[in-house]
Amino acid sequence: NVTRSSMPPMEEYVEEIRSLWDSHWLTNNGEKLKKLEAALKERLDVPYAALFTNGHLALEALLKALGLKGEVITTPFTFASTTHAIVRAGLTPVFCDIREDDYTMDPARAEALITPRTCAILPVHVYGNLCDDGALSAIAKKHGLKLIYDAAHAFHVSRDGVSAARMGDAAMFSFHATKVFHTVEGGCVTTADPELNRRLEPHKEKGNFMPFAQLMDLFDQYPVVVGCGHPFRAGGHVPEL
């Protein structure tokens, strides 16, 4: 069904914007962004959640942060952005057919597509139906491949107590206005791997690996013009979590 985007009560949204306005902190990892990130980690039961401008950039950054080269087995039964992110990361998509009952990637067919050039498997959770993570994880481990999930359709979905945000090496979530939870535009990468989360940082902050607090100390010494993050979007949607 086509539905209208969910919206918080106007009064709550205005209050969030007012507090943002009063703080004068409009970008660069502000309080609203950190509050949303903390709420996401708690709700999705995952140690790390890296926020991005949209789901496409989150997936593209994830592929680049993993340092992958070669072919990525994925599914054509998805929004075009999944494939575009693979191509923009300098990788080659290899399409795998889906299962008829839940429209998710068929693990047996995925394994049959593995070649010496395969570097990762990128399945897509569909309409809230989770992929067969047990089978796909076993295949990825057997062949030494990364397992990355497009979880745009699986916000706060779990199986046997395991959150979709914890499946595979990492997962991408979209917060586009058409999603169950949205920030009008937005997305994130979730992972339990601290090193991968660290490697995502330069893709968020103009190539910089330095911890944010340390970077701010340098800015106090050497003023520059910088900008990242969208607290106007983040602030208004924390109440929805």
Task: Name each model feature, range by range.
Residues N1-L26:
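N-terminal "arm"/small-domain region of PLP-dependent enzymes with the aminotransferase-like
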Residues N1-R4, L51, F95-D97, F173-S174:
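Structural signal for conserved beta-strand scaffold positions within catalytic alpha/beta enzyme cores
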Residues E12-E16, E31, K35, S81, ...:
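Generic alpha-helical secondary structure signal
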Residues W21, A154-D160, M167-L241:
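Active-site region of PLP-dependent enzymes
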Residues W25, N29-E71, F77, H84-R88, ...:
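Phosphate-binding glycine-rich loop
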Residues L44, G67, P116, A165-R166, ...:
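Structured loop/turn residues at beta-strand edges in well-structured enzyme cores
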Residues K64-A151, S158:
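PLP-dependent aminotransferase-like
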